[in-house]
Amino acid sequence: MALDATVQPTKLRSVTTEHRMARYTLIAVSLLFLLLILLLPLAAVFVEAFRKGAGPFLEALGDAETFSAIRLTLVVAGISVPLNLAFGVAAAWAIAKFEFKGKAFLTTLIDLPFSVSPVISGLVFVLLFGANTWLGHWLTANDIKILFAVPGLILATMFVTFPFVARELIPLMQEQGTADEEAALSLGASGWQTFWHVTLPNIKWGLLYGVLLCNARAMGEFGAVSVVSGHIRGQTNTMPLQVEILYNEYNFTGAFAVATLLALLALVTLVLKTLLEMRYSAEISASRRH
């Protein structure tokens, strides 16, 4: 009597067949956490800002000092983000495309702001450009203001935000390799043409994503900017600093009005980030089909 040598495979238990109660419990816990930690506080900010109506809200945003803080925030972000964009692309290109001594050290330096408190970052600039330092004496003698002025705010913001673009691009460029660039160079393209027509299209989504994160952090930075700003009303206060000042003065409508504007900027950043991810996923799917 012959034995059937066919072995029926044992049906593996899939994660998707786990007990429904466990699945729904995990989903409920996640949603509850987001509700308590994120959505309720965010809603409270908007409710408090409009508690007295739209008139006081708009009046608070139209205050001269608040308007100056909004304008200064946009100026600082508008200068620091493009500078960090240029640095991030250059650093990512060097690390991903070339081999050189000190490469690991450069990568570590890029990550430094992630591990250093923003307050310490601000103190570094105070120690570097302070009035009692050699460099501070030289700056004073030449009537150049760094601390308690816009240049100090820009430097502090750049220090805190410069890893974002580079950290988005480095793994992306390493994964892509150097084959495309080498092919372009072998066909006679210049370095600039290679970057503009080959490298940049390949990294555009990661680049935009890094810029969004960098801009969001630049507008919301508090610690480093607080140390170097001097809290001069109407001159060196950014939006986060203005929120603190108004709140400490019990001007809750003004404080929450500015906080609402910051929250809206964060929401816009989140929406743009989601759209970029969707566009990138669609582009990847289309390229795989072809």
Go through the PLM ranges and name each one.
Residues 3-4, 25-29, 40, 44, ...:
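C-terminal transmembrane helix and the adjacent membrane-cytosol boundary/short C-terminal tail
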Residues 10-16, 54-62, 67, 102-103, ...:
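Membrane-interfacial helix termini and adjacent extracytoplasmic/periplasmic loops
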Residues 9-21, 45-82, 97-98, 245-253:
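Periplasmic/extracellular loop-to-transmembrane helix junction in inner-membrane transport proteins
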